[in-house]
Amino acid sequence: MVLHSDKGQTVVILGLGYVGLTLAVVMAERGFRVVGVEIQERVVELTNRGIPHFFETQMEQRLKEVVDKGKLVACNEIPNNIDADIYVITVGTPLSESGSVRLDMLKNATNEIAMHMSDSSLVILRSTVKIGVTKNIVCPILEKTKKKFHLAFCPERTLEGNALEELVVLPQIIGGIDEASSWSATQVFQKITSTIICVSNVETAEITKLVDNTSRDVMFAYANEISMLCDVVGANMMEVVQAGKKGYPRTNIPLPGLVGGPCLSKDSYILDQSVSTYEVRPNIIMASRKTNEDQPAYVANFLMQLANMLKWKDNIKISLLGLAFKGRPATDDLRGTMAIPVFNALKNVFPNATYCGFDVLVSQTDTEEMGLIYTNSIDHALEDAHLVLILNNHPTFEHFSVSQQTHLMSKPGVVYDFWNTMDIDNTNFTDGVYYFATGSHKLCTNLMGEQ
């Protein structure tokens, strides 16, 4: 390990995923000497070559710059001779197969810190956790060392795909186990962003992070529920949203769509499990999560009815466009992507279909590991397809000329758009290819009958 020996605090970041590596780059740029710890050898190797292992705007250039300057190095474990001032935990806290929050990686990271930290070290937890984890799990592990330390929960709240920019402009919430810990964490993050929000205790910081994400999940679920009402009454959800908020400041409904990703797909469960021993239950939040999780099956059942109307045979070709969990800002992240439950729901109703996938950033290997046939262009995805589904809102799908490419599809064919990227009345599709969008099922069916 070779770090540039200029003055500056040494920070060890445990976990070099989407959260850890972006933070590592920004901290290195702001004068910290950064050691990134990651158990995946491939990630360590790539990082030390200045090559990001995921897509993030500006990451390639900025990572290479701090690595070349000796400001950031990666390794598999905390070096024995480390003289670090700060330790930051950014490891994942995914759900297990049973649905419970996994804390094994968090505990392992904390134990590793405990073995290496010196007196008065600052430990910062940024991973999303159940309320109480900082005090009841992380703190006791560190206390066993009999060393003095500062501990704070400082949640990551950046938008994946735009994280490098948001790290330096978003307010940073800080909740320390005591005033000294909050002060120490503030001194660190003041070098990164200009706005610091110190809350009264750790629990407030923990629940604030969960509220940020679960409130968005609820908001999107409301939009999806209204879209289902529009589906059956013959309204256009896109028009409802636009009309409702035009010149009227008290209605701001988002568009409907698939809701997933590494945060929104699990944080409702983390919040629910946080209060499982109390009488109060997050009923609205959990009902909203179910609404969003039910979208794939709901749409698949509608498409099966549509297939019967169009008299499709069993051996149809179905292409999925947009496999990453979101398209804007662009990412190649498949964690929590709704493409997988959509794919599974479609297989239930079209078991003999051939399934292809296209994404601007997702690799051929990852596409094929999902069980899809890889296509390297939209043209190839549309060629001979009976059904094309737009799964995320990547700009490519908003701007590509569908009217010029639907001639490649089998007839009758359907383009189903989860994101309402096109104008229902002005798609100008090739004859025999029909457009359907979330929140306008009945309206689109009526338009199909008029063609």
Where are these regions (language model features)?
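Structural/interface elements that position substrates and couple domains in central-metabolism enzymes
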Residues: M1-Q451
